[in-house]
């Protein structure tokens, strides 16, 4: 038993928080294969029962970043990866928004995986749309540079995550690893729109982003529990801008968007969700388009492309109506 895991389990058994340096060391021990399955399970369960701190989340992310593959990216790159886990069954809102954001001129390094909530993750829907999940890091760099968007499949860039797959599966509960995806972008995206599935995660993830040196980001959770900027009502959000953290509320009706029901946003199988995304990019109007505009507009504000969400929504609408967003999809398909 390593010193780090012994000390960590001792502290967790007393419901005490782990110091950042100790957390970083114990994750390194985990990644190097020095921990037994029982120790890994105890660590993850202990953190979950105690409640993970922003410092613990950031230390996990820093250790995993060091173990993952990386790509070079333009300075203004953004990611729309969220935590998932809201179990809402909506279509792939942030993935669809990624095409719109890229069409508006902000490079998007979309980090994602197969489904974590609902029935369809970003990888599942992009695969249905004809985008290769097997792009090499070199190809992804080219896509980002010349097309303005790429998909970074988490399984390719973070093979070390496989070291805890069995323990996570056998525990069967949410663990700290469910929070890490948005913090592990291989392109090091300095801008983010990060949806979380619970109001309790909002300040934690915002603080973790601040610790990790995020340039500017918006963390959001809908009052309906959606891990997106929602269209059914208000969204609680936090803007991280360098060293500052600023809470605010997003109300769709203030931007001329009609409220809808969760039923209006429902998705289905990967094939069905792919069709929803395609129809939006082809110009279909309605609540599905509107929630994509709202999320893309918020992301463009986070990326400093727009002075506010209202201007961001206008830029997002132009991206869709001009065909630029659809063109991003077509170029990515052609490069597969």
From Swiss-Prot:
Q: Which GO terms describe its biological process?
A: L-tryptophan biosynthetic process
Pathway in which this enzyme or protein is active: Amino-acid biosynthesis; L-tryptophan biosynthesis; L-tryptophan from chorismate: step 2/5
Give the Enzyme Commission number: 2.4.2.18
GO CC annotations, alphabetized? cytosol
Ligand binding (Mg(2+) 2)? 227-228
Catalytic activities: N-(5-phospho-beta-D-ribosyl)anthranilate + diphosphate = 5-phospho-alpha-D-ribose 1-diphosphate + anthranilate
Reported cofactor(s)? Mg(2+)
Which amino acids does the record list as binding anthranilate 2? 168
User: Per UniProt, which keywords does this protein have?
Assistant: Amino-acid biosynthesis, Aromatic amino acid biosynthesis, Glycosyltransferase, Magnesium, Metal-binding, Transferase, Tryptophan biosynthesis
Offer an example of a GO molecular function term for this protein: anthranilate phosphoribosyltransferase activity
Q: How is the cofactor bound?
A: Binds 2 magnesium ions per monomer.
Q: Which family does it belong to?
A: Belongs to the anthranilate phosphoribosyltransferase family.
Q: According to its UniProt entry, what is the function of this protein?
A: Catalyzes the transfer of the phosphoribosyl group of 5-phosphorylribose-1-pyrophosphate (PRPP) to anthranilate to yield N-(5'-phosphoribosyl)-anthranilate (PRA).
Instruction: Write down the PANTHER family for this protein, in alphabetical order.
Output: ANTHRANILATE PHOSPHORIBOSYLTRANSFERASE
- Subunit organization: Homodimer.
Q: What is this protein called?
A: Anthranilate phosphoribosyltransferase
The species is Desulfitobacterium hafniense (strain DSM 10664 / DCB-2)
Source organism phylogeny: Bacteria, Bacillati, Bacillota, Clostridia, Eubacteriales
Q: Which gene encodes it?
A: trpD
């Amino acid at each position: 038993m390593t010193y780090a895991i012994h000390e960590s389990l001792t502290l967790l058994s007393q419901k005490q928080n782990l110091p950042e340096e100790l957390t970083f060391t114990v994750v390194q021990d985990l990644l190097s294969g020095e921990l037994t399955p029982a120790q890994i399970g105890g660590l993850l369960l202990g953190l979950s029962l105690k409640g993970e701190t922003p410092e613990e989340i950031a230390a996990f992310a820093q250790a995993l970043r060091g173990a993952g593959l990386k790509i070079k990216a333009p300075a203004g790159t953004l990611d729309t990866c969220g935590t998932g886990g809201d179990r809402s069954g909506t279509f792939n809102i942030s993935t669809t928004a990624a095409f719109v954001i890229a069409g508006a001129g902000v490079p998007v390094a979309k980090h994602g995986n197969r489904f974590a909530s609902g029935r369809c993750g970003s990888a599942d829907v992009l695969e249905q749309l004809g985008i290769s999940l097997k792009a090499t890091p070199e190809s992804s760099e080219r896509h980002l540079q010349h097309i303005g968007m790429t998909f970074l499949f988490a399984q390719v860039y973070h093979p070390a995550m496989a070291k805890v797959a069995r323990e996570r599966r056998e525990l069967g509960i949410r663990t700290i690893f469910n929070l890490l995806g948005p913090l592990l972008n291989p392109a090091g995206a300095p801008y983010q729109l990060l949806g979380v599935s619970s109001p309790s995660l909002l300040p934690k993830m915002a603080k973790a982003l601040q610790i990790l040196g995020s340039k500017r980001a918006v963390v959001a959770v809908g009052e309906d529990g959606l891990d997106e900027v929602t269209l059914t009502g208000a969204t609680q959000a936090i803007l991280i801008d360098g060293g500052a953290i600023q809470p605010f509320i997003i109300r769709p009706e203030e931007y001329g968007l009609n409220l809808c029901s969760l039923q209006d946003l429902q998705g289905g199988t990967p094939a069905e969700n792919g069709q929803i995304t395609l129809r939006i990019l082809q110009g279909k109007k309605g609540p599905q388009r509107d929630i994509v505009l709202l999320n893309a507009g918020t992301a463009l504000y986070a990326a400093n492309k727009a002075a506010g969400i209202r201007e961001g929504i206008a830029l997002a609408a132009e991206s869709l109506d001009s065909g630029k967003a659809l063109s991003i999809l077509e170029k990515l398909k052609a490069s597969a």
